């Protein structure tokens, strides 16, 4: 579950521990842990498209949720994301979301 803390620019992830307590941790911590797991699975192999891989993993759900939040209003979505509407349209097309 993702939510943004009020009065903060930090996105957080809600997690449930073994005592069924809900805790919040910054999204970046989850990304860092996912990358640690990914590197552990590489077994020393090199990878050439890591930036694009990580960006796609974050960008697609971001676009999806923003478009849902704005009820498909691309102008509002672009403003919310701080990008040009043409850039938004290009990204939506890239992920087959147009």
From Swiss-Prot:
<keyword id="KW-0804">Transcription</keyword>
<dbReference type="Pfam" id="PF02954">
    <property type="entry name" value="HTH_8"/>
</dbReference>
<dbReference type="GO" id="GO:0003700">
    <property type="term" value="F:DNA-binding transcription factor activity"/>
</dbReference>
<dbReference type="GO" id="GO:0043565">
    <property type="term" value="F:sequence-specific DNA binding"/>
</dbReference>
<keyword id="KW-0805">Transcription regulation</keyword>
<protein>
    <recommendedName>
        <fullName>DNA-binding protein Fis</fullName>
    </recommendedName>
</protein>
<dbReference type="InterPro" id="IPR009057">
    <property type="entry name" value="Homeodomain-like_sf"/>
</dbReference>
<comment type="subunit">
    <text>Homodimer.</text>
</comment>
<keyword id="KW-0238">DNA-binding</keyword>
<keyword id="KW-0010">Activator</keyword>
<dbReference type="InterPro" id="IPR050207">
    <property type="entry name" value="Trans_regulatory_Fis"/>
</dbReference>
<comment type="function">
    <text>Activates ribosomal RNA transcription. Plays a direct role in upstream activation of rRNA promoters.</text>
</comment>
<dbReference type="InterPro" id="IPR002197">
    <property type="entry name" value="HTH_Fis"/>
</dbReference>
<feature type="DNA-binding region" description="H-T-H motif">
    <location>
        <begin position="74"/>
        <end position="93"/>
    </location>
</feature>
<dbReference type="InterPro" id="IPR005412">
    <property type="entry name" value="Fis_DNA-bd"/>
</dbReference>
<comment type="similarity">
    <text>Belongs to the transcriptional regulatory Fis family.</text>
</comment>
